Curated annotation (Swiss-Prot):
GO biological process, one term: translation
GO molecular function: rRNA binding; structural constituent of ribosome; tRNA binding
InterPro entries in UniProt: Rbsml_uS13_C, Ribosomal_uS13, Ribosomal_uS13-like_H2TH, Ribosomal_uS13_bac-type, Ribosomal_uS13_CS
Name of the protein: Small ribosomal subunit protein uS13
Disordered, as annotated region: 94-118
Similarity field: Belongs to the universal ribosomal protein uS13 family.
Source species of the chain: Haemophilus ducreyi (strain 35000HP / ATCC 700724)
Statement: the UniProt record of this protein carries the keyword Amino-acid biosynthesis: no
Disulfide partners: none
PROSITE patterns for this protein: RIBOSOMAL_S13_1, RIBOSOMAL_S13_2
Amino acid sequence: MARIAGINIPDQKHTVIALTAIYGIGKTRAKAICVATGIAEDVKIRELSEEQIEKLREEVSKFTVEGDLRREVTLSIKRLLDLGCYRGLRHRRGLPVRGQRTKTNARTRKGPRKPIKK
């Protein structure tokens, strides 16, 4: 298994799919990384040479991924909570933040229904 950005990349998968195992890299960014390094998207990780894997490491290191990205997201949410702005209040209450309706939907964000006590 190749190790990129502190993550063991599954070597039986194609390069594009395997790169998405890294937090912060989706399909679009994975394709861009493959184009930048000159590696075909349909080549499996185990078929890559050590220098190609090193190219992938260098390209991935240009992005904020894994622990740094998680920390950045957590700090930005914490900043909203500390400001006491509308978005921060929605985060604090566990409600949808981006204007979605809450009268009927939003079960994922609100959690399971609470029974009404009579």
